[in-house]
Amino acid sequence: NFSLGLSLFSRIMTSAVQIMDKFDEYDLLAWEKHHNRKADSPSGTAIDLARLILAHSTRKSEVVWDKLDRRPQPQELHFASMRGGHIPGTHALCFDSEADSIELIHTVRSRSTFAFGAIAAAKWISGKTGIFSFDEVIGDFLC
């Protein structure tokens, strides 16, 4: 995924998961929404985000993608995947307690974000050899 915003969202989300992991009163859940023409559910991006969450949370150790007909277990991250309308893509993470809720949301408004990211990556990789991730591209911009 070549979205600059999503890459930054992933970094913010990782930090938030590490911080909020210390507060047992907050449960963690996530969801994604995409247009009704998208064939995969969950999306590759949602799968990547779920992996990041599990890698940085000591309380969540598995993802449940399907509909639940029971209470989620404490170690389960329930990640909902919705399809409908014309939504290019929205991914959200929620830390919820009895007292309050904190939500992090990234919404693609235009597919031009992917073109912008691809062009930035092409400029960045010029003269380099090897295999790189888009996260490495963004990492250099943040240094």
Q: What positions do the PLM features span?
A:
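A contiguous active-site-proximal alpha/beta segment in oxidoreductase catalytic domains
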Residues: 1-32
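C-terminal substrate-binding/catalytic lobe of Rossmann-fold NAD(P)-dependent oxidoreductases
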Residues: 22-143
